[in-house]
Amino acid sequence: AMISDTQRWYNSTEDVVKALNARGDIDFVIHGGDQSDFGVTKEFIWMRDIFNKFQMPYVCLLGNHDCLGTGEDAYRAIYGDPNFAFTAGNVRFICLNTNAMEYDYSEPVPDFNFIENELNNLSPEIEKTVFAMHVKPFEFVFNNNVAKIFQLYVNQFPKVQFCLYGHEHKFAVDDLFNDGVLYFQCPCIDKRIYLLFTIKEDGTYD
């Protein structure tokens, strides 16, 4: 399942945790970023305490609002590096910081070294890939000088199923590069919507 942009909507976030727990068929949850609005440490702690009520594993991406003030420090203290990856079954999930506008080029965003390291060290058991990020390519917060290069890297991974993102607070599905890789946008939690995906052995998904 995916949720995103929960900033300041604590009651709706509590509700989605209860709803996903009640389903009984969720393997894990990806939060698409912006759990804080102002990068205040207490915002991260309040949200973390809500997320810890999930009865399944969850991960949180770094959003652009999470970068404000000392927000990234709080994020790193609670969740770790904003570029990370994990494996579920034979699917590699690659989660990236794409909030380039929040940086002064002191850090590579997106981090192609991280992406290339993932590509070069994939287990032979990995058959499919999913990318998750807060901001999609061609949105102004993304470093659009490298948008097409980013997608070239994406397409080198085995059987990319789709890409996930948040940020714009609405639902959308787009083939951004006209290459068959769909980008799914998860709305903000105030819309009381989550996305649910089932990845099948035959390479299809619902």
What are these regions (language model features)?
Residues 1-46, 126:
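N-terminal active-site segment of His-dependent metallophosphoesterases
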Residues 41-128, 148-159, 170-201, 205:
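Extended active-site neighborhood of metal-dependent phosphoesterases/phosphodiesterases
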